[in-house]
Regions:
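Membrane-interface helix-capping segments at transmembrane helix termini in multi-pass transporters
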Residues: 25-34, 60-71, 80-104, 148-154
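Alpha-helical transmembrane segments of multi-pass membrane transporters/permeases
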Residues: 1-11, 63, 67-70, 103-106, ...
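Structural signal for membrane-spanning alpha-helices in multi-pass inner-membrane proteins
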Residues: 18, 45, 84-88, 139-143, ...
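Alpha-helical transmembrane segments of multi-pass membrane proteins
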Residues: 39-46, 77-82, 86, 92-115, ...
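Transmembrane alpha-helix boundary and packing residues in multipass membrane permease domains
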Residues: 19-23, 37, 53, 57, ...
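Transmembrane-helix boundary and interhelical linker motifs in polytopic inner-membrane proteins
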Residues: 25-29, 40-73, 120-123
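Signature of the first transmembrane helix
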Residues: 1-49
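Hydrophobic alpha-helical transmembrane segments
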Residues: 100-103, 129-175
Length: 176
């Protein structure tokens, strides 16, 4: 199930999300969007994955409790957002709406990368599958939000939020 979960997630990204963004944004803006998404993957992905792996390896020796990584993820996400906003300013794309959406995407994605750790710890492959299903469905619904708002980051933000909401209800990872 865990292979199917990530396969579904990647299929939605590669065959629905990215092609739709490519078609609607145009070559230049799509290239900029991919670079911005690379920043999200590198910065927020590293932050969230570091917390995820740290929790996995420290589980037996340090006995961390749920919520222990919340502050780290928030601070890490804010630092990622600061770097991302500097980049937007540098390439002269910083507007109030892009600042809000990109900062939110960077912060939420850091948390999302961490969110599946409890499913791994408890070997709950069904919940792990539904976590990635929630993100995938969120990305697809996010394309509708993008069509209405004309803000491409809303497509991704919707998917990330769907994943976080599922993790918040299906696990205790963010609760003390």
């Amino acid at each position: 199930l865990n292979i199917g979960a990530t396969a579904l997630f990647n299929l939605v990204i590669q065959f629905a999300l990215y092609p739709y963004l490519n078609k609607t944004l145009g070559k230049e803006m799509y290239g900029t969007a991919l670079f911005m998404l690379s920043l999200v993957a590198i910065a927020s992905g590293s932050c969230g994955t570091a917390a995820n792996y740290s929790r996995l390896v420290s589980e037996k020796t340090l006995r961390p409790s749920n919520g222990d990584y919340n502050l780290f993820l928030l601070v890490g996400g804010i630092l990622c957002a600061a770097v991302g906003l500097f980049y937007l300013w540098w390439i002269k794309l910083l507007t109030p709406i892009t600042a809000i959406l990109f900062a939110a995407l960077l912060i939420v994605t850091a948390f999302r990368y961490y969110s599946d750790v409890e499913f791994k710890l408890k070997t709950s492959f069904v919940r792990y599958f539904f976590f990635y299903l929630a993100i995938s469905v969120g990305y697809l619904l996010g394309l509708l939000v993008y069509r209405k708002t004309n803000q491409w980051m809303t497509a991704l933000l919707t998917g990330e939020i769907f994943g976080l909401v599922y993790a918040a209800f299906a696990s205790r990872i963010y609760r003390h």
